[in-house]
A protein has these predicted regions:
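Conserved G/P- and acidic residue-centered "switch" motifs that form tight phosphate/ATP-binding loops
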Residues: 27, 41
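Short hydrophobic/aromatic beta-strand micro-patches
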Residues: 43-45
C-alpha cells in the first residue's frame, strides 16, 4: 500500500507554512509494502539557520496523526543514525 494522493496533499498542505525545506517519505509506505498497521515515516530538513523545539515537533506529530488518522514518525534528516540514513537514502521519496 502506498499513500493516497489525498494523504500526500494533506501532508503538503500541512507543511506549506512551516519552516521545512525538504520533506521525504521512507519506510513501508515508500516501498509500497505498508499495511493497515503501518506508520508513516517522514524525514525533514529545515530552512537554513532554523531550529524547531521538541514541543514544536510534538505539535507537528499530533496534528499530522489527527489529519491522517495514522501514527506518524517525524525525524530531522541531520539526526538520523548512520545505519538508518543508508536505508533512508535508498528508499526516500520526495514530498516537498
Amino acid at each position: 500500500m502506498y499513500l493516497t494522493n489525498q494523504q500526500i496533499e494533506i501532508i503538503k498542505n500541512y507543511f506549506s507554512d512551516k519552516p521545512v525545506n525538504k520533506l521525504y517519505l521512507f519506510g513501508s509506505y515508500a516501498r509500497g509494502d505498508a499495511d493497515e498497521n503501518s506508520d508513516i515515516d517522514l524525514v525533514f530538513s529545515l530552512h537554513k539557520d532554523t531550529r524547531i523545539s521538541y514541543f514544536g515537533l510534538a505539535k507537528y506529530l499530533v496534528d499530522l496523526e489527527k489529519k491522517l488518522n495514522r501514527k506518524v514518525d517525524l525525524v530531522e534528516e541531520e539526526l538520523l543514525y548512520p545505519r538508518i540514513k543508508s536505508i533512508f537514502d535508498r528508499e526516500k521519496k520526495t514530498i516537498l
